[in-house]
Amino acid sequence: MWIDVAPDAVYSYASDPRQLATWAAGLAEGGLRLTARGWVADSPMGEVTVEFTATNALGVLDHVVRLPSGEAVYNPMRVVPAGLDATACEVVFTVRQRPGVTDEQFEADVAAVAADLESLRGLLEGQ
């Protein structure tokens, strides 16, 4: 998803767990909150925890969602500058089809991520 905003600004906003509820519907619905166990949200499957990559200068926004089953789902995400001194960037979120996930469920996951990234773009571009 291309965003017509400087990569540093996009990274700053997207890397702040407190802002996730404004653009990531799945976590917004679950009421992402900081607890003694870390960032936690309620999901249709039960309570999940979300572990975020440490703040970095490379635009890496990877995160791990731990499901109630104990399964850890790794979500690679990047803010990639359009070039040196760029005033725009591409946000890349890799969605993988895990074992046991049907094609329909996978397609729904892809659509949900695309909608979340569209929300992020709209917020940051002021649309």
Segments predicted by a language model, with ranges:
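Hydrophobic ligand-binding cavity/cleft-lining segments
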Residues: M1-R33
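Generic structural detector for well-ordered beta-strands
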Residues: W2-D4, E51, R78
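Hydrophobic pocket/interface hotspot
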Residues: V10-A14, L20, W39, F52, ...
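Short, exposed beta-strand/loop patches in secreted or surface proteins that constitute
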Residues: G30-L34, A41, F52-A54
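Short acidic/polar mixed-charge low-complexity motifs
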Residues: P44-V48, E71-V73
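Short, conserved beta-turn/loop elements at beta-strand boundaries and strand-helix junctions
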Residues: N56-V60, L84
